[in-house]
A protein has these predicted regions:
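N-terminal targeting sequences that direct proteins away from the cytosol to non-cytosolic compartments
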Residues: 2-8, 14-78, 84-124, 132-198
Length: 198
């Protein structure tokens, strides 16, 4: 029972707390440079863009948290979070993508259309989702309802890993998300095992 509760809590944390497909797909081969340091998550590591500013994590469920500056210095910035819970906790790629979709709505109040893709990089199976619409941002306070943010986007990625899946989530204004999609793809595809100590 405890393991089931941990799994449920993990999926809730990843989902948000907790566009549409006419957007052209961005090639994974886009010319995007990464200059930032390597960041460890579980037994893996990723290359982080220097323009992403690391922040103190807001909960123990977050393995890392970054603020992405707004476009042209105006409006809202974006938030990138990576989650890691260990082996067997956090849910499958399908479950988490469904949870992410459940936080985004279209103008009629229905779940927003989502673009889901799967690929393999460096031997790791990766599932990704792109969603645009109204984001129901969950506030981590009892009794406080979600805060709707219109014209927002969500990028999500799940890297399947025997030592525990890695979950990436990037939320922000639609234009910011669209502009950063190639960079997000590069971060996800930068996954590598950490070097083992001799």
């Amino acid at each position: 029972m405890r393991r089931v509760m941990l799994w449920i809590m993990a999926v809730m944390f990843i989902a948000g707390g907790k566009a549409i497909l006419a957007k052209p797909a961005v090639s994974r081969d886009a010319d995007v440079s990464l200059y930032g340091p390597s960041f460890p998550v579980g037994d893996l590591k990723f290359t982080i863009p220097s323009k992403w500013k690391i922040e103190p994590v807001e909960s123990p469920a977050r393995g890392g948290q970054w603020r992405v500056p707004p476009l042209h210095g105006e409006g809202d910035g974006g938030e990138v979070v990576v989650f890691y819970f260990g082996p067997g906790i956090g849910g499958s790629a399908k479950e988490n993508i469904e949870a992410w979709i459940g936080t985004m709505f279209n103008a009629e109040g229905h779940p927003a259309a989502a673009e889901v893709k799967h690929h393999t990089t460096g031997g790791f199976k990766i599932s990704q989702v792109v969603i645009f619409g109204t984001y129901n941002q969950v506030v981590s306070l009892p009794g406080v309802p979600p805060v709707p943010k219109s014209n927002y986007g969500l990028l999500g990625a799940v890297i399947e890993n025997p030592q525990g899946n890695i979950y990436w989530r990037f939320t922000g204004p639609e234009a910011l998300i669209t502009a950063n999609l190639p960079l997000f793809n590069k971060v996800v595809d930068s996954v590598k095992p950490q070097e083992k100590a001799p």
